Every structure is written in structure tokens, then in C-alpha cells.
């Protein structure tokens, strides 16, 4: 997260956009304190984005720099501030169907307002390059049960949309 002068500059930018553009503002600044969230909210930011990435069980296989609980605590602070929470994850990172289900349930339990679902696009030279692209039916099944478990959330298709046809 930004701190000090950088955070103050971000606050100024959000205040300016809120005042002059009259648009909904969403911040995505990583781990953040309750005080910083409050300042963002006062500056006109109404939503905060912070993906949980995957299930609690699969998280250590994907990320070693921080914990799943740190992600959850950040999202709880967002909700406590009265802001809209935007959080989702990436499918196709070697997780099981149960992991996807657990991620959908975790997001429902947190009352997440907007859920971006990203489908991994394996890129040569990256740690997950060996994984196969997801099939269109797998992506659609995942979206379907995310919708069922999170009926009020805005489900957003993000990375991997190119894997879907127009059929």
C-alpha cells in the first residue's frame, strides 16, 4: 500500500476526480489500514478492490509473500468502512473444483459486492506456463455456481474472456 506523501497524492487525485468528474471511484492499493480506507472514503472513493485470488486451502500454493487471512482482514475493513468491496480471483491455477467452490463461498460470507473472475492465460516463462488453458464449459460452469452462491453480487468476467465464444 502507499504511505506518506504517495498516499496523500493519491487522496488529492481521488478528491479531484470526485469533485470534477462526478464518477464512481474504486481504489486498488493492496493492504491498507482502516484509517487509510476512511480517508479514501472521505475523498469520494466508494469501492475498494482486493482479490482473494483462490481458496484458503490453495492460497499457499500461489502466494508466499502474505497470508490469506491478511486478504480477508483487508476486505472486512472495507465492509466495516461502508464501502463496496470488489474481490474475486483467478481460475485455472491448478486448483480443484472444491477450491473454486470454497472461493465462491468465502466471497459470499464476506458479502462481496463485485466479483471479478479471471481465467488464467498461461504465459511462457512464468511459473504457471505448464498449465492448460481452461475450456469454455469449465469457465461457464464456474461462472454459473459463482452466480448461484453470490446472487446479489456483480459478477465480472475479466482476464480470459478471449477463451469464450459468442455462442
Where are the language model's segments positioned?
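Residue-level recognition of alpha-helix initiation/capping sites
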Residues: 8-9, 31-32, 69, 98, ...
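Short, small-residue-enriched loops and turns at beta-alpha junctions
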Residues: 2-5, 65, 91-96, 123, ...
Amino acid at each position: 500500500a502507499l504511505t506518506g506523501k504517495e498516499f496523500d497524492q493519491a487522496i488529492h487525485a481521488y478528491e479531484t476526480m470526485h469533485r470534477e468528474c462526478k464518477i464512481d471511484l474504486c481504489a486498488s492499493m493492496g493492504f491498507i489500514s482502516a484509517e487509510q480506507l476512511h480517508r479514501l472514503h472521505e475523498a469520494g472513493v466508494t469501492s475498494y478492490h482486493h482479490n482473494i485470488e483462490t481458496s484458503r486451502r490453495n492460497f499457499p500454493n500461489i502466494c508466499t509473500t502474505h497470508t490469506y487471512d491478511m486478504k480477508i482482514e483487508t476486505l472486512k475493513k472495507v465492509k466495516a468502512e461502508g464501502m463496496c468491496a470488489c474481490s474475486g480471483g483467478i481460475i485455472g491455477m491448478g486448483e480443484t473444483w472444491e477450491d473454486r467452490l470454497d472461493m465462491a463461498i468465502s466471497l459470499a460470507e464476506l458479502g462481496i459486492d463485485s466479483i471479478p473472475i479471471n481465467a488464467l492465460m498461461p504465459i511462457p516463462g512464468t511459473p504457471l506456463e505448464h498449465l492448460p488453458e481452461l475450456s469454455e464449459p469449465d469457465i461457464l460452469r464456474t461462472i454459473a455456481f459463482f452466480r448461484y452462491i453470490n446472487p446479489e453480487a456483480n459478477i465480472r468476467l475479466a482476464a480470459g474472456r478471449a477463451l469464450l465464444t459468442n455462442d
